[in-house]
Amino acid sequence: MAAKIIDGKTIAQQVRSEVAQKVQARVAAGLRAPGLAVVLVGSNPASQIYVASKRKACDEVGFVSRSYDLPETTSEAELLALIDTLNADNTIDGILVQLPLPAGIDNVKVLERIAPDKDVDGFHPYNVGRLCQRAPRLRPCTPRGIVTLLERYNIDTYGLNAVVIGASNIVGRPMSMELLLAGCTTTVTHRFTKDLRHHVEHADLLIVAVGKPGFIPGEWIKEGAIVIDVGINRLENGKVVGDVVFDEAAARASYITPVPGGVGPMTVATLIENTLQACIEYHDPQGK
């Protein structure tokens, strides 16, 4: 069996086009365009690339994009003060603080300072809690983007045995909640998991997010499984690969996401979706 490729790049472009049309309709109706504030502290090269892609997406869909590039020496108090200012700004619907933050700044404190109705990354405890309680509003971008991919490919998730490799706050944990909502029987594995191969071999839907190139051999994949590879790893030769050995896995799976061009584009597209949602549901006069 040769797997069908889940083309995240194309689906992400569809999502962005849909958002752009809604923004045009808003502006034509006399409503303001959604606003996103992107905050970058320091000069981490990977972070700069991610931030640039988010700003480009904002411009493409017609958002008002505000950039705050702060020096590495920025104190936690200064960053919190900026967030307070943005929380109070009625033209800003979403606040994104690019992680990781420099040493000496508490990630948790910063993320909790963002108003839940402007938390378009979906990391605030309020939004994570709503997801856990089956009443999601602003949902973490990568897990929600993966659900969108499955939906757009008309993949029926109800009753599937889903296995999530990796238990991070950004992907693994919220992904497990999304999969429960999608009707899966869900297992989350982590560094203390015994016999990882056993879990992988029984997965109808496998989502891998550990950040280790080729971590899951293709021979472990169940025949006909759906494989979602969240990993983005750059090898010494410059090649970008996922956490799954792609060619081997693609020979056994029914569907698989490539790296690059799979999950990555969906994370940014979902951020854009979340910002529009925050604008409509929380900040429009009729949404309150």
UniProtKB/Swiss-Prot annotation:
Pathway named in the protein's UniProt entry: One-carbon metabolism; tetrahydrofolate interconversion
Enzyme nomenclature, EC number: 1.5.1.5, 3.5.4.9
Record-linked PROSITE patterns: THF_DHG_CYH_1, THF_DHG_CYH_2
SUPFAM superfamilies listed in its UniProt record: Aminoacid dehydrogenase-like, N-terminal domain, NAD(P)-binding Rossmann-fold domains
GO-annotated biological processes: L-histidine biosynthetic process; methionine biosynthetic process; purine nucleotide biosynthetic process; tetrahydrofolate interconversion
One of the record's GO cellular component terms: cytosol
Domain of life: Bacteria
Keyword annotations: Amino-acid biosynthesis, Histidine biosynthesis, Hydrolase, Methionine biosynthesis, Multifunctional enzyme, NADP, One-carbon metabolism, Oxidoreductase, Purine biosynthesis
Pfam families xref list: THF_DHG_CYH, THF_DHG_CYH_C
Assigned protein family: Belongs to the tetrahydrofolate dehydrogenase/cyclohydrolase family.
NCBIfam families registered for this protein in UniProt: PRK10792.1, PRK14186.1
Functional summary from the UniProt entry: Catalyzes the oxidation of 5,10-methylenetetrahydrofolate to 5,10-methenyltetrahydrofolate and then the hydrolysis of 5,10-methenyltetrahydrofolate to 10-formyltetrahydrofolate.
Subunit structure: Homodimer.
Protein name per the record: Bifunctional protein FolD
Gene (name only): folD
